[in-house]
């Protein structure tokens, strides 16, 4: 699997812990938990994601978002939809129906299903003419096992593409993944928003 070449070690515990999603299950103490509560998606998150996306926008042929539009108008999804070029294809994968976002004339598509179904998703990508992504954002189920699976999509990351992970502060999957990426192969920003749920980024060297 892709993570086996991109991580410095296996982050799995080979226990039920590997399927835990929430920060409360993780045992990771958020360094700023005394500031709780904060919004699920903060202005700092949105600004950081927009800033990184704009760096690659002009060469970004397609965007993949795992976990779609769960915060209505404040959702990260709208950063991509509002700022992508007209010819850039947006594909969002979510376990729930997000088809209200679909707009083929604007190259906006969603897939209802489990992001673990990679083979099926890739076939849909091919049908849409997508062979690589200039930006991949992972914000689905936050367990260790699921993030390892979702990382498989980075095999389709363009040479100049960026991967973003939300909830890296204390959710187990994103937290342990971003902190164990092989920095000989990847440039890594482990957490640019440490005062909330956090967001991290990686791009190939």
Task: Pin down the residues of each PLM region.
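A short alpha-helical cap/connector motif
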Residues: 1-137, 141-205
């Amino acid at each position: 699997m892709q993570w086996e070449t991109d991580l410095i070690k296996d982050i799995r515990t080979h226990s039920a812990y590997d399927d835990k999603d929430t920060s409360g299950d993780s045992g990771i103490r958020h360094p700023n938990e005394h500031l709780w509560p904060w919004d699920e998606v903060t202005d700092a998150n949105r600004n950081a994601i927009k800033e990184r996306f704009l760096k690659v926008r002009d060469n970004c042929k397609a965007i993949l978002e795992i976990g779609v539009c769960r915060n209505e108008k404040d959702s990260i999804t709208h950063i991509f939809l509002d700022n992508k070029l007209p010819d850039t294809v947006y594909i969002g994968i979510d376990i729930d129906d997000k088809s209200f976002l679909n707009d083929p004339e604007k190259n906006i598509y969603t897939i209802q299903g489990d992001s673990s179904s990679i083979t099926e998703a890739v076939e849909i990508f091919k049908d849409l003419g997508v062979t690589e992504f200039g930006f991949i954002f992972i914000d689905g189920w936050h367990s260790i096992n699921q993030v390892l699976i979702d990382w498989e999509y980075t095999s389709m990351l363009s040479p100049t593409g960026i991967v973003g992970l939300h909830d890296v502060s204390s959710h187990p999957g994103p937290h342990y993944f971003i902190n164990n990426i092989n920095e000989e192969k990847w440039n890594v920003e482990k957490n640019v928003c440490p005062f909330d749920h956090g967001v991290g980024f990686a791009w190939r060297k």
